[in-house]
């Protein structure tokens, strides 16, 4: 737990560490056909990096920071059922929604030309 980074992706902020995997929303909006297994990913929206006792904060994002990773697979979250009904109006509507997620693993955190591994 010496090295971690906080990234901004999919409308949320994630705390990522090298060697761990995470689920991301809206990651498959790029093109679902290119997100096969072991597709390499670079994430440039890095908000903060903590390495040993050093902390690097960015004004919005860090300039020379990238997160290198690869997509393991894409999958759907559990289905949510939405049921709307108005009493005495005979109005009923049933909707379903499944969130599309991409599971990716962080290989390394790069900052100023240095790569930090687990």
From Swiss-Prot:
It holds the Pfam family Ribosomal_L21p. InterPro entries: bL21-like, bL21-like_sf, Ribosomal_bL21. GO terms for molecular function: rRNA binding; structural constituent of ribosome. Keywords: Chloroplast, Plastid, Ribonucleoprotein, Ribosomal protein, RNA-binding, rRNA-binding. It is found in: Plastid, Chloroplast. GO terms for cellular component: chloroplast; ribonucleoprotein complex; ribosome. One of its GO terms (biological process) is translation. It comes from the Eukaryota. Its main location: plastid. Belongs to the bacterial ribosomal protein bL21 family. Part of the 50S ribosomal subunit. This protein binds to 23S rRNA. NCBIfam families: L21. This is Large ribosomal subunit protein bL21c. It comes from Anthoceros angustus (Hornwort). The lineage of its organism: Eukaryota, Viridiplantae, Streptophyta, Embryophyta, Anthocerotophyta.
């Amino acid at each position: 737990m010496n090295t971690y980074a906080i990234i901004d992706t999919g409308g949320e902020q994630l705390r990522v560490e090298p060697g761990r995997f995470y689920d991301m929303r809206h990651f498959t909006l790029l093109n679902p056909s290119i997100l096969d297994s072991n597709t390499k990913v670079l994430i440039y929206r890095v908000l903060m990096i903590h390495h040993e006792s050093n902390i690097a904060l960015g004004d919005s994002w860090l300039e020379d920071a990238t997160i290198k990773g690869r997509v393991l697979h894409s999958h759907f979250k559990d289905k949510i059922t939405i049921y709307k009904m108005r009493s005495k109006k005979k109005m009923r509507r049933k909707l379903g929604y499944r969130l599309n997620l991409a599971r990716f693993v962080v290989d390394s955190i790069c900052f100023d030309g240095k790569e930090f591994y687990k």
